[in-house]
């Protein structure tokens, strides 16, 4: 089944690409979610008429993500947690804890945007945490974990 993508989809394509996908993936996921339309002649013509509008929306999303990244790059967060004598935490600091700390600091961040490639943080210290705001925009936040 051929579809025209209405937004960027990881490992598939970007806005306006005509791609071939399995029929079930197109019918049951891409089209109902509004991420693609079937590649008929009528839909192709309609997409070309809306292309400028869709590209403008995508550029606005990118610019707002870049503005948020500029704010986040200047932020240092301090999280207090119970820890043992050697700095090992009783528990861990995960994506939700970091997102909540950033939200309390006045910057709205969803926990899905926080990237912890090595898993939850289990020691006191300073950590550079990546915040993925857009597929092209990543911000770095310095998180300091101190014991109570």
UniProtKB/Swiss-Prot annotation:
Keyword match Ribonucleoprotein: yes
Signal peptide limits: none
Family listed: Belongs to the bacterial ribosomal protein bL9 family.
Keyword annotations: Ribonucleoprotein, Ribosomal protein, RNA-binding, rRNA-binding
Molecular function per GO: rRNA binding; structural constituent of ribosome
Phylogenetic lineage: Bacteria, Pseudomonadati, Pseudomonadota, Gammaproteobacteria, Moraxellales
Gene Ontology cellular component terms for the protein in this record: ribonucleoprotein complex; ribosome
InterPro entries to which the protein is assigned, alphabetical: Ribosomal_bL9, Ribosomal_bL9/RNase_H1_N, Ribosomal_bL9_bac/chp, Ribosomal_bL9_C, Ribosomal_bL9_C_sf, Ribosomal_bL9_N, Ribosomal_bL9_N_sf
A GO BP annotation: translation
Main function: Binds to the 23S rRNA.
Protein name as it appears in the record: Large ribosomal subunit protein bL9
One Pfam family cited in the UniProt record for this chain: Ribosomal_L9_N
């Amino acid at each position: 089944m051929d579809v025209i993508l209405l937004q960027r989809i990881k490992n598939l394509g970007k806005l306006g690409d005509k791609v071939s996908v399995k029929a079930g993936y197109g019918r049951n996921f891409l089209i109902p979610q509004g991420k693609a339309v079937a590649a008929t002649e009528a839909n192709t013509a309609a997409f070309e008429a809306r292309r400028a509008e869709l590209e403008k929306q995508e550029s606005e999303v990118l610019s707002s993500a870049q503005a948020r990244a500029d704010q986040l790059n200047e932020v240092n967060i301090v999280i207090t947690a119970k820890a043992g004598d050697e700095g090992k935490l009783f528990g861990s600091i995960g994506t939700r804890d970091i997102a909540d700390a950033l939200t309390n600091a006045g910057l709205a961040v969803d926990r899905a945007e926080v990237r912890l490639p090595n898993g939850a943080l289990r020691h006191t210290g300073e950590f550079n945490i990546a915040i993925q705001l857009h597929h092209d925009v990543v911000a770095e936040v310095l998180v300091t974990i101190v014991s109570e």
